[in-house]
A protein has these predicted regions:
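Glycine-rich phosphate-binding loop and adjoining beta1-alpha1-beta2 segment
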Residues: 1-20, 363-393
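Short, well-ordered alpha-helices that flank and scaffold nucleotide-derived cofactor binding pockets
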Residues: 13, 60, 144, 356-360
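Conserved active-site and cofactor/substrate-binding residues in soluble primary-metabolism enzymes
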Residues: 3-6, 10, 53, 130-137, ...
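A short, basic/flexible loop-to-alpha-helix module at the beginning of a structural domain
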Residues: 36, 124, 313-342, 349
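Glycine-rich adenosine-cofactor-binding loop
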Residues: 1, 131, 135, 139, ...
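Metallocofactor- and cofactor-centric catalytic cores in central/energy metabolism, strongly enriched
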Residues: 232
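A glycine-biased structural micro-motif
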Residues: 4-5, 155-158, 339, 389-390
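E1/E1-like adenylate-forming module used to activate ubiquitin-like modifiers
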Residues: 19-20, 24-32, 36-137, 141-150, ...
């Protein structure tokens, strides 16, 4: 029975049916629940997501993990398939560089303005033709990013295929002076932290890492509440805790409501409130944060906690299986493909179309992430679910 199964598991089963050599990891989770360390071993990845919020978090995850990636999607009203290519470097543009304040607000980000149209996470309307065209653009750029083919990846560009007019365009993305995705996460050296640091106090951790009062702390994906107000007495406070961990009002003991959430803060502002709390109040295994000195912002350092182990389903031994790929185009580097681990975030209609195109190649590993399950209304138009249901009889 396909209905009710996680989309990530459906995608995994399809990959295994057509490819018995690749290691596969299928994860059912919301991206905000995953630390960036999970993705650190990938050579390249694709964001195949509808939600602006999920795309924003995915971009920050890949910048922190230093994973080159493609953001694929459709502009349904214009019949455009699109793909944006990012090298995950501090001085290279990503898709978020072009987002307006309204788009960031719709993504659920705190930009200091109310947004009555914040996204719910539901998919955007499109057609299968658009999805498959966007998947083709993304698959080609993924192959180029990894060096699996000799083509030059279009890093820092957005590619668009107009299905109505049959026109293909590419344009270079502008590099914003201060991208909301915080490219500083991809800058500087990486310092690996011991797991025991999660049990230390935030003050001790920041002191060990060299943070001063004027140092900026940039959190990878989690946001802390910098300003909250009591729903009863109206007293305001700066708790600097996760929204899910807000405590009661210090004045009257009633519930606090979040007013301002931040991922970048000055340590001197937060320290008086949270320095004595455990580092786990902000961080988890696999998490990361950047410290940016006030006097030398170009000398940022990323500090990373070791990630929890990812459960890979091992593929079959390669042995002499190369003969099966004798008809692969000569432009494909089969030996290199066997060394590469890739990721696909999103296994809905677009992700399914992408996985169909990538699954037959004998990658070393493929990580698939999606939070949703297959619904009855999805089966007919979800290519992988329809195939598996047909195979099941």
């Amino acid at each position: 029975m396909i209905v009710g199964r996680p989309k990530a598991a459906v995608a995994r089963d399809h990959v295994r049916r057509v490819n018995r050599w690749t290691d596969i990891a299928a994860v059912q989770a919301d991206l905000e629940e995953l630390p960036p360390g999970i993705f650190a071993g990938l050579d390249a990845a694709v964001l195949a997501l509808d939600s602006l919020g999920a795309r924003f978090i995915g971009t920050r995850l890949f910048l922190t993990a230093r994973v080159p990636h493609v953001d694929a999607g459709v502009l349904a009203d214009h019949w455009h398939a699109r793909a944006t290519v990012s090298a995950a470097v501090p001085d290279g543009a990503c898709q978020v560089d072009t987002w307006s304040g309204t788009q960031l607000a719709r993504a659920g980000e705190d930009v200091g303005m109310p947004c009555v149209a914040a996204e719910t996470g539901d998919g955007a309307p499109s057609t299968l033709a658009m999805g498959h065209a966007a998947a083709a653009l993304a698959a080609h750029e993924l192959l180029a990013l990894t060096g699996a083919i000799a083509d030059r990846p279009r890093i820092g560009e957005e590619l668009r295929l107009d299905l109505r007019r049959g026109r293909y365009d590419a344009f270079r993305l502008p590099l914003a002076a201060a991208c909301a995705a915080d490219h500083v996460l991809a800058a500087g050296r990486v310092e690996r932290l011991d797991p025991s640091c999660l049990q230390a106090s935030l003050g001790a951790l920041m002191s060990t890492c060299g943070a001063g009062a004027d140092t900026s702390v940039v959190l990878a994906t989690r946001a802390v509440v910098a300003l909250a107000v009591c729903e009863a007495c109206g007293e305001s406070t700066g708790p600097y805790l996760l929204a899910s961990a807000l405590e009661t009002c210090p004045a009257c003991g009633m519930r606090l409501a979040s007013l301002r959430r931040v991922r970048r803060l000055r340590w001197g502002e937060a320290a008086p409130t949270v320095a004595r709390r455990a580092a786990s109040a902000w961080f988890r295994a696999g998490d990361a944060f950047a410290l940016v000195p006030a006097t030398e912002p170009a000398r940022a350092t990323l500090f990373a906690f070791p990630p929890p182990p990812l459960q890979w389903e091992p593929g079959a031994p390669w042995d002499g299986a190369a003969e099966r790929f004798a008809r692969l185009p000569k432009s494909f580097d089969l030996r290199r493909i066997r060394t590469l681990r890739i990721g696909v975030l999103g296994a809905g209609h677009l992700g399914a179309a992408l996985i169909e195109q990538l699954a037959p190649l004998p990658w070393q590993g493929m990580l698939i992430v999606d939070r949703d399950v297959v619904e009855a209304r999805n089966v007919a138009s979800h290519s992988l679910a329809a195939r598996l249901e047909e195979a099941a009889g």
